[in-house]
From Swiss-Prot:
Membrane topology field: Peripheral membrane protein
Membership in a protein family: Belongs to the ATPase delta chain family.
SUPFAM superfamilies for the chain: N-terminal domain of the delta subunit of the F1F0-ATP synthase
Recorded GO CC terms: plasma membrane; proton-transporting ATP synthase complex
Compartmental location: Cell inner membrane
The protein's name: ATP synthase subunit delta
Major site of localization recorded for this protein: membrane
Higher taxonomy: Bacteria, Pseudomonadati, Pseudomonadota, Gammaproteobacteria, Aeromonadales
A Pfam family that the UniProt record links to this protein: OSCP
Amino acid sequence: MSELTTIARPYAKAAFEFAVEHKAVDQWLGMLGFAAQVAENETIHNLVNGSVAAEELASIFVGICGEQLDEHGQNLIRVMAENGRLGVLPAVVAEFVAFKAELDKEVQADVISAIELTDQQKANIQASLEQRLARKVKLNCSMDASLMAGVLIKAGDLVIDGTVRGKLDRMADALQS
């Protein structure tokens, strides 16, 4: 997956910088999202990975996307087709979203708990993370009974393991060393 990210990042960065410069970040996000859905279509996926000439592939792709892509979006598709990179469009979108989140000072936080969290607990976790990270935090909450009790929080590079399972694992490691 990191190879896809490495390939996708320059395209996403170029598109994002262009979008910011032209105050069209949301429009570009929509265009790229639509193009990524087209790229994930099985028939198109087979064309992208087949032996179709880049120019012809770009024309087919742009034709399918129609008015969903403006002139600049079409140019990006053509460049990616010429370089044989249309298959990484979903990764380009993921990178673009990450750049947008950084611009908007937002971060996604995965909160995994042993039991269902109440709305108040979610609000407390969100407020604490926003204060600690100095960013707007969006929570993705899920449950995992194997944690026994407590909460595991992952936000970017930050991992907070307040679970009983995590504490037991750390104690076992300490006893073995």
